[in-house]
C-alpha cells in the first residue's frame, strides 16, 4: 500500500462548500497519477484585477507561487515553482503543472483583491 501511495500526487483546495462565494477553485480535490498534466482553475466574479496562487504544505506557512495584476500580466512568486499560469481574462487565473510529482502534493489556494 505504501508503494501505491507514492505513485499518486494529491492536491487539496480551499473550497467554499455550500456557502456563497465570489471566488471559485476547481476541482476541489484531486488525486492524480505521477507524470500527468493538471490544470487547477480559479475564477472570480468580483472584477478584481489582482489574483494570486498560494501553496501550503501540511503544518507550514503559505507561499506565494504566482500572481497577476491584470490581463496578460503574470509573475512568479516567492516559491520556485514548476507550475505556469495564464491570465487572458480578468475573471480567470488557471494554474498548470505539466508533469505531476509526489513533491507537488500540497494545498493550493487562489485569492483575488482589488
Swiss-Prot record:
Database matches in Pfam families: V-set
> What is the protein name stated in its UniProt record?
T cell receptor beta variable 25-1
Q: Where mainly located?
A: membrane
| SUPFAM superfamilies xrefs | Immunoglobulin (SSF48726)
Q: Where in the cell is it found?
A: Cell membrane
* Keyword Calcium tagged: no
This chain is encoded by the gene named TRBV25-1
* UniProt keywords, alphabetically: Adaptive immunity, Cell membrane, Disulfide bond, Glycoprotein, Immunity, Immunoglobulin domain, Membrane, Receptor, Signal, T cell receptor
The domain of life is Eukaryota
Species: Homo sapiens
